[in-house]
């Protein structure tokens, strides 16, 4: 009788510990366990935007070098698929701000929002071949500086409400 009660109590304790543990036994964990995420190579995030020219930066953010960033718009809908992929991804060229990466000229994006960032001006030069027609106006000197300053000012005067769809 005592042995039976001891077995029942021991079984109940074991099952309780198993139920309350948050190990990778029954949860959706990466291959190799939770610590294996830091060992995994980051893949390029999904393409998005017009013509697939952009890359996802978050579930509702799509940025392209030439087009800027789309936040909460139809161009960023494909980025919601990233939530269902098992491996982590990374977009952008260099780190900026607090946990973000440079997404376009003067724009730093994290997975939640985008802000104007002066340190994101370097490294975004569109390279075109001589044979390739360009539909963009090439700005140099004062005109470029003025345009970038206007983008920065527009970014600092935005409201905190990030629920509205925006194009940067």
Swiss-Prot record:
The record marks 32 as: Important for agonist activity on V1aR/AVPR1A. It holds the Pfam family Hormone_4. One of its GO terms (molecular function) is V1B vasopressin receptor binding. Disulfide bonds join 24-29, 45-89, 48-62, 56-79, 63-69, 96-108, 102-120, 109-114. This is Vasopressin-neurophysin 2-copeptin. Glycans are attached at residue 135. Residues 1-23 form the signal peptide. InterPro entries: Neurhyp_horm, Neurhyp_horm_dom_sf, Neurohypophysial_hormone_CS. The modification Glycine amide is found at residue 32. GO terms for cellular component: dendrite; extracellular region; extracellular space; neuronal dense core vesicle. GO terms for biological process: grooming behavior; intracellular signal transduction; locomotory behavior; maternal aggressive behavior; maternal behavior; multicellular organismal-level water homeostasis; negative regulation of apoptotic process; negative regulation of female receptivity. Neurophysin 2 specifically binds vasopressin. It is found in: Secreted. Belongs to the vasopressin/oxytocin family. Interacts with vasopressin receptors V1bR/AVPR1B (Ki=85 pM), V1aR/AVPR1A (Ki=0.6 nM) and V2R/AVPR2 (Ki=4.9 nM). Interacts with oxytocin receptor (OXTR) (Ki=110 nM). The keyword Signal applies. Keywords: Amidation, Cleavage on pair of basic residues, Disulfide bond, Glycoprotein, Hormone, Secreted, Signal, Vasoactive, Vasoconstrictor.
